[in-house]
């Protein structure tokens, strides 16, 4: 914790966490599949407090949190083929919570001076910052290998997570997070003209976020649409998606945010390194 004289303050935050992972999946018996993701969690966040005192001096207190850790996800899915045209699927996912590994420290800058910053309180974040378990469940309906409709639910008990000390954010606490999603994807034909082989996607979601400001919860809802463009050869799909997300506080509308995201991804379905067999 750091202190300064009476005056005005301004806050600014940047950064975030990223994950790089490898996924593995396989079928145990007919209709039953299991999978797992092994990920590397990394990133840096910056919480800046600008302090302007009554003596006309300005200081910057920058709290830096650097994370370097692993992350695991597990899943199981069962698929029931009712007949040649209709199928149902149900799945469960679980990601274990854990204390985060990394370091945190504060750097103090004197804005009115060119002097090097002072480093305050360099320490490990182990047992001070953590992420909770994540539970997920979903059901899906498939028609004629062309139409997919899916609903899913996600729960994260953020109220049990550790977040350490955040300067001037004592009124902000964490609460459990819920998310409900519904989406559909339609591919007119697996073969034929190119436009008929494009996959069209549409979905929406509602969530109660994990932040609680005083007695106000953060609500979020959004809509998304996208397309899957098959590449020549049919083994690779280029995915383009658009998201609109609205976030606001309730019962008091403290802050209202609107986001528009564009997503681009590639799915590789080629059986690399596998030699063809003569029959």
Please state what every model-predicted region is.
Residues 1-279:
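Outer-membrane beta-barrel porins/channels
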């Amino acid at each position: 914790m750091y202190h300064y004289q009476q005056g005005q303050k301004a806050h600014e935050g940047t950064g975030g966490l990223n994950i790089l992972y490898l996924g593995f999946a396989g079928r145990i018996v007919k209709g039953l599949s299991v999978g797992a993701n092994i990920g590397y969690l990394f990133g840096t966040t910056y919480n800046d407090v600008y302090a302007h005192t009554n003596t006309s001096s300005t200081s910057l207190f920058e709290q830096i949190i650097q994370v370097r850790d692993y992350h695991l996800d597990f899943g199981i899915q069962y698929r029931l083929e009712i007949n040649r045209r209709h199928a149902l699927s149900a799945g469960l996912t679980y990601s274990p919570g854990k204390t985060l590994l990394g370091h945190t420290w504060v750097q103090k800058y004197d804005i009115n001076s060119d002097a090097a910053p002072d480093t305050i309180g360099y320490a490990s974040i182990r047992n001070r910052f953590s992420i909770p378990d994540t539970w997920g469940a979903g059901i899906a309906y498939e028609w004629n290998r062309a139409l997919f409709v899916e609903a899913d639910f996600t729960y994260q008990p953020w109220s049990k997570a550790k977040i350490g000390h955040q300067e001037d954010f004592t009124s902000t606490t964490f609460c459990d997070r819920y998310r409900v999603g519904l989406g559909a994807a339609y591919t007119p034909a697996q073969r034929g003209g190119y436009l008929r082989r494009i996959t069209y996607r549409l979905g929406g979601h509602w969530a109660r976020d994990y932040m609680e400001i005083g007695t106000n919860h953060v609500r979020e809802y959004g809509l998304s649409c996208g397309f899957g463009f098959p590449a020549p050869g049919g083994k690779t799909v280029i995915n383009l998606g658009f998201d609109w997300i609205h976030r606001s506080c309730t019962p008091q509308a403290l802050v209202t945010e609107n986001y528009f995201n564009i997503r681009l991804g590639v799915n590789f379905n080629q059986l690399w390194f596998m030699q063809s067999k003569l029959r």
